[in-house]
């Protein structure tokens, strides 16, 4: 992980990498050790796109909350996005083993069951938690798109 931006800009944490774990019998997932320092003060877990879960630092959550709050409430899509983001969100804290608890509603959304393989990825300012089955499909689609971009670039 590193801090992005120039010395004069506000620094933002950037999470990088891909890690495999298993959801334990109590619905907990190990957060990679290189990400834990940033989550010591707690974090927020919420629904992400493509059936992943997002883990945000408290600061990044506040930034995202402000963006969501500024969306026009007169637009149906904005209201739906806000509802999905906020109603599915939970405050969380790492336990002494570096794990976070994932409640049943978020496990169902992300298609992650007890004892399932899980992929935890750094995705810039957020950490994403994926069912490894879903992650492999997403990565396969991304690899194909990347190959097409390379063909276009020549």
PLM regions: where:
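Flexible "stalk/tail and boundary" regions
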Residues: 1-21, 25, 35-92, 96, ...
């Amino acid at each position: 992980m590193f801090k992005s931006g120039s010395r004069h800009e506000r620094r933002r944490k950037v999470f990088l990498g891909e890690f495999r774990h298993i959801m334990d019998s109590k619905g907990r997932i190990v957060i990679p050790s290189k990400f834990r320092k940033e989550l010591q003060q707690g974090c927020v877990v919420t629904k992400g796109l493509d059936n992943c879960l997002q883990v945000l630092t408290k600061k990044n959550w506040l930034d995202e909350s402000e963006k969501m709050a500024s969306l026009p409430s007169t637009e149906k899509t904005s209201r739906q996005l806000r509802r999905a983001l906020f109603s599915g969100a939970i405050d969380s804290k790492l336990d002494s083993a570096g794990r976070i608890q994932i409640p049943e509603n978020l496990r169902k959304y992300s298609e992650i069951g007890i004892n399932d393989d899980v992929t935890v990825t750094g995705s810039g300012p957020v950490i994403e938690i994926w069912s490894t089955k879903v992650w492999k499909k997403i990565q396969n689609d991304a690899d194909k798109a990347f190959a097409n971009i390379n063909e276009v670039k020549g």
